Regions:
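Short, contiguous strand/loop micro-motifs
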Residues: 2-3, 53, 106, 208, ...
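Conserved DEDDh/DEDDy metal-dependent 3′-5′ exonuclease domain
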Residues: 3-13, 17-27, 32-169
Length: 375
């Protein structure tokens, strides 16, 4: 497979200028994310229908032409299972490609599994079996091997022609508009940034804690997320989640107590004094400053029956629409709906099952069903 390497600012500028004459491109990224909070970009792959380009980001300092291309609405961008790629674009360039279409989403509206992999898609459409042995390689190491580069090039070379076929299938089935709506929703979901002050709500078993312990967890989770972003370190490499919960639960007053509840030596050495200061701050809060107790969704009266009834409604809609129930509503989305209905968690805007194409199919029936489950 022929491809060109792009390693300098001038080469990137020339490539982006030429590419903007094409109506559509296939995109992919390779990145590493083992200990870091943010994904570390290792390679960008691009195919315009004539040229496969592999862009090495390590030597490029001026990304303006790339940003301009990604925002050029005259050039459609196709990715496959692109949720993590979107995060890479957002963190590297501060933007989302526009317009963007995810071929995994297109395929789901044409009857394929929701998590249909790229290799399976290529095999169905071309009969070829791709070598995926390089998928876990270190994309930051240099030089990249010929095998790595061939693997990376294949990801976009086959994607673009298949994307065209999937667009035709989605249009023929009548679901193209819904598929594009789902692509937009995926982008919005990726752009949501967790407020450090709300990070405590995502800690497992937070609902088991009493109000002062919750106040402590709120302070601890806020600090940990800010520290992770500041140092570009995965949150569990700052302090492990179960250890953070234990600090909030037992509210220790000394380094020795931190050790006794299971914190690692490095956690105590680097962060012990900070953790103890946050515990002391939580201890000093007046009662009126403490958060309300957290209610666990699964402990709500009627949760299991409500979940079962929603699943049944989703299955009925799936049968009527000839879409998979998995595409219509995941467990996460059903739980999001019930959290929204019972007002257990703060939510930004309308819950996903009530919005967009899902809302058009299900909102009225869901509202009627939920009337039978008051808080």
């Amino acid at each position: 497979m022929n491809y060109q390497m792009i390693t300098t600012n001038d080469e990137l500028a020339s490539l982006c200028e030429v590419t903007r004459d094409f109506p559509a491109i296939a995109l992919d990224t390779e990145f590493v994310r083992t200990r870091t909070y943010y994904p570390q970009l290792g390679l960008i792959q691009m195919y315009d229908g004539k040229h496969v380009s592999l862009i090495d980001p390590l030597g490029i300092t001026d990304w303006t032409p790339m940003r301009d291309l990604l925002l050029d609405t005259a050039v459609t961008k196709y990715l496959h299972a692109g949720s993590e790629d979107l995060e890479v674009f957002l963190n590297t360039f501060g933007i989302m490609p526009q317009p963007l279409i995810d071929t995994q989403i297109l395929a789901a509206f044409s009857g394929r599994p929701l998590s249909w992999g790229f290799a399976a898609m290529v095999e169905e459409y071309t009969g070829l079996t791709l070598d995926k042995s390089e998928s876990r390689t270190d994309w930051l190491a240099r030089p990249l091997t010929e095998r790595q580069l061939e693997y990376a090039a294949a990801d976009v070379f086959y994607l673009l022609p298949i994307a065209g076929q999937l667009m035709k299938e989605a249009e023929a089935s009548g679901w193209l508009s819904a598929a594009l709506d789902e692509c937009r929703m995926t982008q919005l979901r990726r752009q949501e940034v967790v407020d450090p002050k709300e990070a405590w709500r995502d800690i497992s078993n937070a609902w088991q804690l009493r109000t002062r312990q919750l106040a402590c967890l709120q302070l601890l989770a806020d600090w940990r997320l800010r520290k992770a972003r500041e140092r570009d370190l995965a949150v569990n490499f700052v302090v492990r989640e179960e250890h953070l919960w234990a600090v909030a639960r037992y509210m220790p007053g000394s380094l020795g107590e931190l050790d006794s509840i299971g914190l690692s030596g490095s956690e105590i050495r680097f962060h012990g004094k900070t953790l103890l200061a946050l515990v002391a701050k939580a201890q000093a809060l007046p009662e009126e400053a403490l958060p309300e107790p957290l209610l666990n969704l699964m402990d709500m009266p009627g949760y299991r029956k409500a979940f079962k009834d929603i699943k049944a409604l989703v299955q009925a809609v799936a049968t009527e629409s000839k879409l998979s129930a998995e595409l219509l509503a995941s467990r996460r989305q059903i739980n999001q709906l019930l959290n929204w209905h019972w007002k257990l968690k703060p939510q930004n805007g309308m819950t996903e099952m009530m919005a967009g194409w899902r809302g058009e199919l299900m909102a009225d029936r869901l509202n009627t069903l939920l009337e039978g489950y008051p808080r």
